[in-house]
Amino acid sequence: MQYQSEVIEFLDEIHKAGVRYLLIGRRSIIAYGGPVQTMDYDIYVDNNPENLDLLFKIAKKYDLVPNKSKEEIRKHFMFKLENDFSIDVFCPKFFSAGKGKKLSFVELYDRRSIAKGEKGFEINLPAIDDLIALKKLGSRPKDLEDIQYLEGLKQIKGE
């Protein structure tokens, strides 16, 4: 699929340019070896203006256009970059995890794992425990399946 390679090229470029991001959602489960499928790409990005400007600059090279204005993005903290493919972009400073707990981008980014692929490709992933916490926010059946996989992976790794 052509769009798949374009998405990979885009992710590679934002990584190499130093955009502060994490691949989240089911694509991150796949990156951890999970036997799941998805067509979606979701990223969580640092919402400081310089970081978002760098993301938008690179997106423009791929003719990816935000589906919301910058003002709307600042209010809602979620948007899509769209063209022949789309990427869901989340950019709140933190997600509320209930009981006063917060999952902040800065903390998740500081604990990130970097997955390495072919030809020098690298991608930022949340640490397994952080990905479990993010998946618990969804609590859909597929999120629960993903959590089971990640818990099993932790056991295998001895964590």
Enumerate the predicted regions with their spans.
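Compositionally biased terminal segments of proteins
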Residues: M1-E159
